[in-house]
Regions:
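Intrinsic-disorder/low-complexity, polar/charged segments enriched in Ser/Thr/Lys/Arg/Asp/Glu/Gln
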Residues: 1, 14, 59-61, 206
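Feature activates predominantly on carbohydrate-active enzymes
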Residues: 199-387
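Intrinsically disordered, low-complexity Pro/Gly/Ser/Thr-rich segments with frequent PxxP/GP/PP motifs
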Residues: 30-71
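Acidic, contiguous N-terminal accessory segments
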Residues: 75-215, 219-250
Length: 388
């Protein structure tokens, strides 16, 4: 059941109510109190009864019989809505959380940070926990870390770590000069270690990182940086090693995260920040889902219509609002230069990008931009589970 409230001071008439969200009105659905107009996947247009005038303070309720799947969350209903008038103009409509008949828990959004324990199960703060930890003594937390890299691989890792910490923790000064109180960090090549393995040796007044290459050195620095941040921010909970050893290597060779930018677009700066977060947690694969029914996000010179047409959604465009977007034009795509920059950014952090182009299925956006790819004998007798 969906209710439109007129909170304005004047009556409205001759309108259509358009909405989208995760919810999907089935192709066989019926409406009580109105009529179903246009419908594509998660986009639905509702027509009020003929001649309806919604006065100031009045409400109009429509009951839809036939959703593609039942609601499970308060975000499953209409997340974006607007009124459409005959002249093509629109008026944004505010939406409220979906409620079910009966009891409703308070809506939650975002995350609930896990509290830092007063008495932790480990003396230092490292995630994931290393394979081998043998610390004989903890000492004072240094003001920061002075990276004394000499060979090319250590220098590249040190530069990447500096950029990583400045990106994620700009004001903390984790990397600093010796004259600013930084703890000396030395780098030593050990060819017997695996590519992502590292060993930290703590001695009074310095730390040594042993690795076989750039990624191993970077992971060693990240381990050291995590320890420093834990001891710096929670000195009564975690310590900083003065003597001992830490040795680690990933248990899994493929440690990935998937991001669907076709259904919801994120800009290049947001992608670079996500890569920084992946690196800080030592993930080494980024699954970049760049196309789907809802949009196409990659610039290709030979097919400019892909981004000119299918990178955008909105009222009056080739692809309507979907998954909660509103009437306004929304979306975007990644230029070739932006993609090159993102790939280089990932490589610096030991991350391999796995681009995902969803075909031959999930090609609605592709076929909207290049209609000659459609089978001329296809009559549209069936649809995907997503309603395309």
């Amino acid at each position: 059941r969906l209710t439109l409230h007129n909170d304005g001071a004047t009556a409205i008439d001759n309108f259509r109510l358009c909405f989208s969200g995760p919810c999907q009105v089935d192709a066989t659905a019926t409406a009580e109190g109105g009529h179903i107009g246009r419908r594509l996947s998660t986009f639905t247009e509702l027509l009020p009864p003929e001649g309806l005038e919604l006065g100031a303070g009045a409400s109009w309720t429509v009951t839809i019989h036939g959703l593609s799947w039942p609601f499970q969350h308060w975000t499953d209903g209409a997340r974006g809505a607007y009124l459409l008038f005959p002249d093509g103009s629109t008026r944004q409509v505010a939406t409220t959380p979906t409620k079910r008949m009966g009891g409703n828990a308070a809506p939650k959004r975002g995350m609930e940070p896990y509290p830092v324990p007063a008495r932790p199960p480990a003396p230092v703060s490292v995630i994931p926990w290393p394979n081998h930890v043998a610390l004989t003594r903890l000492g004072p937390v240094p003001a920061g870390l002075t990276l004394l890299a000499e060979d090319a691989m250590a220098t590249a890792a040190a530069a990447a770590f500096r950029r990583l910490t400045e990106s994620l923790f700009a004001v903390e000064g984790i990397v600093r000069a010796a004259e600013e109180g930084g703890l000396p960090v030395h780098f030593h090549i050990r060819q017997t270690l695996a590519a992502e393995a590292h060993e930290l040796v703590f001695t009074p007044g310095s730390v040594a990182i042993h690795a076989s290459g750039q990624t191993g050195f970077l992971y060693g620095l990240i381990t050291l940086g995590q320890i420093w941040r834990g001891a710096h921010h929670y000195p009564h909970t975690f310590g900083f090693p003065a003597e001992g050893q830490i040795a680690d290597a990933p248990a899994m060779g493929w440690r990935g995260l998937h991001l669907d930018v076709a259904r919801r677009f994120y800009g290049a700066a947001e992608i670079r920040r996500l890569l920084s977060i992946l690196a800080w947690n030592k993930l080494n694969r980024f699954h970049w889902h760049l196309s789907d029914d809802e949009a196409w996000r990659v610039e290709i010179d030979a097919y400019p219509a892909l981004t000119a047409t299918s990178a955008w959604r909105g009222e009056g465009l080739a692809i309507p609002p979907l998954l909660g977007t509103g009437a306004e034009r929304s979306g975007g795509y990644y230029s070739k230069a932006a993609i090159r920059d993102i790939v280089g950014h990932a490589q610096e952090y030991g991350i391999e990008i796995v681009p995902e182009i969803d075909m031959p299925g999930h090609c609605h956006a592709l076929q909207i931009a290049i209609p000659e790819l459609r089978d001329p004998d296809e009559r549209g007798s069936y649809h995907s589970v997503q309603g395309f």
